[in-house]
Amino acid sequence: MISTKRKIAVGILLAFALVFSACKKEGKTKVIRLGHALDVTHPVHKAMKFMADRVEEKSNGELRIDIYPSQQLGSERELLELLQIGSLGMTKVSTGTLENFAPELKVFGLPFLFRDRQHRFDVLESEIGENLLESSVRNRLKGLTFYDAG
């Protein structure tokens, strides 16, 4: 069963590629930069803020996620390219942008692909979903999870 927090918001949270090469160290604290294109009022941004707060709390301050919303670091495509070169640690992008790096993700553009919401989550939590998350690894990107787009 998928937790409610994993079902939040839009698109795919992607690309934990090169996390530690995109970290900077401030004293004992490692910092991961997370960029995205959404406004700070968007539910996904709020979920990312929640995640960042929990990461810092659970790591006793040894790991911090700095969030750069509203395309501060670039468009979705530019964010993916920053991941590839190690200048960014994490991003959240839509499958429409990501399918340029992993054509397998074009499957999400098919109408009526899933019977209902539960079927969608059952598929995405299966080996099929894992394979889709891994499909961008050849381009130095690593998918973490799927998010609900509505």
Regions found by a protein language model. Give the residues of each.
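Stable alpha-helical elements in mature extracytoplasmic
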Residues: 44-51, 75-79, 120, 128, ...
